[in-house]
């Protein structure tokens, strides 16, 4: 039986945050029951996987990243479209952000129901959206792909994959083949 508590209307207590190294280049920013954020530190830049709920929350991720590197945060990957995972993307703009990356089906979800999802999640997760006023609006990808895109962060290969519909129609996973690390978004809980 799963005993983990997930974020909800009744969940108003702060969760302890952990920032754990998974491999040479991969880190996990987690708080029990909250959406997680992946961090990939390449030779020349940083990738964030799932941006948090608000730009204010993103600052907490940035602070942890800055404890281990001063490289620019050039990429934010949206593993799927749920407001609690993506609306913090604008918080990375001052850190060197060049691209917000999502599958094309995720882009379609934002277009079709992004505003509705944002309003619903803000109402359902008050703790995660305490700084709702910091959100400038919907998060739109600047780079989309249909099945797969490969980025090289210096010598580190990063594959961003859309294997098909799962948790949403736009699910994306980030695979580091050299290190055998997979960031799966909400495909696995």
Regions found by a protein language model. Give the residues of each.
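Short acidic, Pro/Gly- and aromatic-enriched capping/linker segments at domain boundaries
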Residues: 6-21
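Short Gly/Pro-enriched turn/cap motifs at secondary-structure boundaries
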Residues: 17-18, 29-30, 133-136, 140-142, ...
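Conserved beta-strand hairpin/beta-sheet module of binuclear metal-dependent hydrolase folds
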Residues: 19-64, 172-186
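Short catalytic-loop micro-motif centered on adjacent basic/acidic residues
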Residues: 28, 47-50, 74-78, 159-160
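Solvent-exposed loop/turn segments at secondary-structure junctions
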Residues: 33-36, 46, 53-56, 81-85, ...
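Loop/turn elements at helix/coil->beta-strand transitions in domains of secreted/extracellular proteins
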Residues: 45, 71-74, 96-98, 156-158, ...
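Active-site HxH/HxHxD metal-binding segment of metal-dependent hydrolases
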Residues: 63-143, 150, 169
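Core dinuclear metal-dependent hydrolase active-site scaffold
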Residues: 144-176
């Amino acid at each position: 039986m799963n005993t983990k508590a997930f974020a909800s209307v009744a969940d108003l207590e702060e969760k302890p945050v952990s920032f754990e190294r998974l491999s040479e280049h991969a880190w996990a920013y987690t708080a029990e029951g909250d959406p997680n954020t992946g961090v990939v530190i390449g030779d020349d830049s940083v990738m964030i996987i799932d941006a948090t709920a608000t730009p204010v929350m993103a600052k907490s991720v940035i602070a942890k990243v800055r404890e281990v590197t001063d490289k620019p945060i050039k990429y934010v990957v949206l593993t799927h479209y749920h407001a609690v995972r993506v609306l913090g993307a604008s918080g990375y703009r001052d850190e060197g952000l060049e691209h917000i990356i999502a599958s094309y089906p995720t882009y379609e979800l934002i277009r079709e129901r992004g505003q509705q999802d944002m309003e619903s999640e803000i109402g359902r997760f008050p703790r995660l959206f305490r700084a709702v006023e910091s959100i400038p609006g919907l998060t739109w990808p600047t780079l989309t792909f249909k099945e797969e895109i490969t980025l090289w962060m210096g010598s580190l290969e990063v594959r961003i994959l859309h294997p098909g519909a799962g948790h949403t129609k736009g699910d994306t996973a980030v695979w580091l083949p050299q290190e055998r690390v997979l960031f799966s978004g909400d495909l696995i809980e």
